[in-house]
């Protein structure tokens, strides 16, 4: 175990050395950025161990240093791999753990931790990263009492005033309103700050809080109203199926918790037809419970087909072993034929071979270089694996005759012909 007093120097030296080693001619490429991120992860692991050993302030100070270093890196390194974002999110989670532990300690430590967070959040490194700046300040809210809250409010006022010169000051204004509300809610409670919450209900983050409050109070009509106002206003392409706080996903949760089966079915069907295939199983379960699955099965598949959510529709056809429907859909639209063909070739070999012949012929007419020719012959090789040797042989002969002046294509065709 590393002594607590050594953690911060080790973290600072590790990150500095890693940045220096991975900087080449003043530039940090994506692989070098990932190397630095791995070193940062090691530092975060040290911080976690320190936190577990009750070194609360040391862990917090080291974690905020890692955060600031990560934000700096985001401004000038190639962080396209996504690893840096993961490090930063992990760091926020660790900072929050630190402040939750410090919240239980004496006032002196709480005030010290709050002062550290405010000081770090004011740094110019967060200019241009407004959400990250205010995410850090949110971590400090749990440390506030009415007296120390004035320091946080003063810091918020300073940041808001400085933002007047920004190109988009409204971003800072929005974050300021959110943090201010969360601070007031922490100090005065949910009921005493409800008016402030509804005054700023246009902000998505605060609307979500209001919805969750309404659900907690079993006021499902209010939760539904707040959710519908946004869900009905947005286009379907805004839908984020994997986001639990997407308005449409939240609306389904409201109906489920309220035990409103009719609205649950309607919303689940809506989400399915928007391409969220997990709601197929949801609908199956609900319909089975009321003995109505068989009578709704075919019509539900028809609606899904008409929705033009091809990937979702075909995925469900595969899971339900609906080979005939899948073949019909692939024949109408040979999109990703060589993926879906493996599910069809056993029962419908001739139809699949014919589709492959046509698809490869059309692709070859558009191909212009060896890279594209390789893709074509890869598909021919797949056709051979599916025991479509006669079709593959005829196709190769036709392509040779049709394109005698494409030596690169002829070369690739000769290679795949050897597999026959």
Report the location of each language-model feature:
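Eukaryote-biased, non-catalytic alpha-solenoid scaffold regions
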Residues: 2-420
